Amino acid sequence: MAETRLKEILAFVNHKGGVGKTTTVQSLATGLRRFGKGYFGRGADGKERKPRILLVDLDPQVSLSFLFGWDQVNSNNKPTTYDALINQTPLPVYKMQEGIYLAPASQKMVSIEPFLNQMAVPRKALRKLLLKPLQEMQGTELADEGVNSILDAFDYVLIDCPPAMSLLTYNALAAASSVVIPVQLEVLATKGIAEITNAVIETREDLNEDLDIRGLLEVMSNDQTKATRQFKEYLSKKFDDYVFDSYTRRDTKMVEAQAMGTDIFTYAPYCRVGQDYERFTKEILESMPQ
């Protein structure tokens, strides 16, 4: 990986829905663009460049794709991650914003497992795609630069996993360099962390020896409740080496931003959760592999 442009492939995993996983992917992607200048060297023009990010949506709910403007209804005939996975064809990437590309999900992914199970190594379908030439679906920006591989075209790949330890999630683990686990500080959301860490260990032993846990991110935190403080203490004691210093708080501004079809940094960058995701983005940047 050191000889390519790509710095990290991050898989965002939690087998419970509604824990801020997709929101975290959206916010990190836009945060990397907003705060990443100065971390990624200089372009051909000699200027410091911002990172280019690829989002891979593996969630049949298609939420990440929707947040970045993918229209499921009017895009039925356009190739998605689903098509690439079952046919092992180049991953279709669509430019959604300046510097942010999307390999969109499809609701058909809810029934993808029988197709994947027909493959020689079902858990490596996505990993193989990331090593293939990409399929640029809009414009020729990447082709004009003379790059056609994901490793050379992007600085970051962010994978949004379904809220289950499914075959799609294991595909993400086999393809990723690291795992980010967004954790809401409540009983049902925290009890599955051990299952995720065990899945990481299993994948590391069988398919991806370089896979690591990038960190646990506390999301939608409320320090004013006793229960939240107790769960913070639990995470610190049990997973201290893996807990990010940054965390995010509940804030209605995030709901408003997404309802308006935009991200928190565009809508309200100085609100509480905007500042929280700024800190998280900078923590990722400052600990980025070189």
Residue ranges, per PLM feature:
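P-loop NTP-binding core
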Residues: M1-Q290
